[in-house]
Amino acid sequence: MTLGSCCCEIMSSESSPAALSEADADIDVVGGGSGGGELPARSGPRAPRDVLPHGHEPPAEEAEADLAEDEEESGGCSDGEPRALASRGAAAAAGSPGPGAAAARGAAGPGPGPPSGGAATRSPLVKPPYSYIALITMAILQSPKKRLTLSEICEFISGRFPYYREKFPAWQNSIRHNLSLNDCFVKIPREPGNPGKGNYWTLDPESADMFDNGSFLRRRKRFKRQPLPPPHPHPHPHPELLLRGGAAAAGDPGAFLPGFAAYGAYGYGYGLALPAYGAPPPGPAPHPHPHPHAFAFAAAAAAAPCQLSVPPGRAAAPPPGPPTASVFAGAGSAPAPAPASGSGPGPGPAGLPAFLGAELGCAKAFYAASLSPPAAGTAAGLPTALLRQGLKTDAGGGAGGGGAGAGQRPSFSIDHIMGHGGGGAAPPGAGEGSPGPPFAAAAGPGGQAQVLAMLTAPALAPVAGHIRLSHPGDALLSSGSRFASKVAGLSGCHF
């Protein structure tokens, strides 16, 4: 190897980039080998020695000067190769890498390259541009009955959009929250004969214009359900309207039932079974102004005259009805007939039954004939007709007694019974206040004695044992001495 060839090699390595890259690739190989006289053969193309990168030939004087400087700096090489070449090659290798290194990296890079390129070519699933409200609305509108459950809504969305099919469990809660929080969706309970899980969901009829021109890409505004106006009840409703529900007379079926009026817009088209509007409310509120007819019975009862305030000289009026029946009505099968009213102003035999009926009518109802205990003694089968007949005065029965004449009928007024009237004598112990039967004064005449015997008969003992006279007037029947003192106070009877 000559010195000129070494200089040409140095010039070619500095001028051509391709040659520099090849020298870089070969530097590692050269640096790793042990001395040799010649450089290894190059596989790549070589640049011409006499051609510079800019296409100018170096002058001969400059070439000779460079050659002399190289010889002085190197001072010769033991292995036959100048040191400047090795130093410059090492600097070039440590410096900026050439295109050869990039090519080497490119050759080593194609391994993982194709998989990344294949993933880029595969298009991922794109999320649909619809909101959850739009997706739910699509699902409900496509159903035949315009109502779906939560599972049916999710099934429709998964079958139509592959993006939601792959990410199913994540967005199901979002559908549930949108159904509950938006007023445009109405929950419909299941019918009793339709078993299953979950309620139905439908659209509010007033939310039809929620989307612009029927496009689900954009919602016009958030739907808010308008509250129902409060009902205006009648200031003075009639009690009959409150009891009957007011379905026919009120005109507005939702006036008394405001809770059911909220579902009136949905009707039965969506399968909503609503109760009838004519059902009465649980209970009418108390009327602030009671009806005037409410106190009609109380006013009539207050204005009715008391039966015990009849003057002594006038017969008492018959009782008005069954509540004031005779005391002997409980022992027989039929009530006592009303006495005749044509007896005149004089005393008549109807005074005693009327008094007993008026006195006992204020107490509770007696036991029925079937519930009364059987009579004891020989008077158990005593018919009611005999009791009634005993109360009547017998014109011929007064012969055995000296109190009344043959043609005169004894009086049964209060004064006559107590001994203040003619025809009867006072009982022996009446003046001392000894207690006794109230009709003991009538023991003189035969008819009155018969009445007293019948009143004190054992047949009336069970009746007296079962009848509880709780009225203050009971004392009138228990003591004959105190009866006369209380006659004056009977005019103000309060029952």
UniProtKB/Swiss-Prot annotation:
DNA-binding region: 126-217
Composition bias, Basic and acidic residues: 47-59
Listed GO biological process terms: anatomical structure morphogenesis; cell differentiation; positive regulation of transcription by RNA polymerase II; regulation of transcription by RNA polymerase II
Record PROSITE patterns: FORK_HEAD_1, FORK_HEAD_2, FORK_HEAD_3
Function: Probable transcription factor involved in embryogenesis and somatogenesis.
Lineage: Eukaryota, Metazoa, Chordata, Craniata, Vertebrata
InterPro entries: Fork_head_dom, FOX_domain-containing, TF_fork_head_CS_1, TF_fork_head_CS_2, WH-like_DNA-bd_sf, WH_DNA-bd_sf
Bias-annotated ranges (Acidic residues): 60-74
Major localisation: nucleus
Biased segments, Low complexity type: 83-107, 329-342
UniProt xrefs under SUPFAM superfamilies: Winged helix' DNA-binding domain
Organism: Homo sapiens
Protein name, UniProt field: Forkhead box protein D2
GO cellular component: chromatin; nucleus
Subcellular location: Nucleus
Pfam families found in the cross-reference section: Forkhead
Domain of life: Eukaryota
Keyword presence, Transcription regulation: yes
Modified residues (Phosphoserine): S96
UniProt biased composition (Gly residues): 397-406, 419-434
Stored SMART domains: FH
Region annotation Disordered: where it falls in the sequence: 14-122, 312-347, 397-444
Gene Ontology molecular functions: DNA-binding transcription activator activity, RNA polymerase II-specific; DNA-binding transcription factor activity; DNA-binding transcription factor activity, RNA polymerase II-specific; RNA polymerase II cis-regulatory region sequence-specific DNA binding; sequence-specific DNA binding; sequence-specific double-stranded DNA binding
Keyword annotations of the record: DNA-binding, Nucleus, Phosphoprotein, Transcription, Transcription regulation
Gene that produces this protein: FOXD2
UniProt note on tissues of expression: Kidney specific.
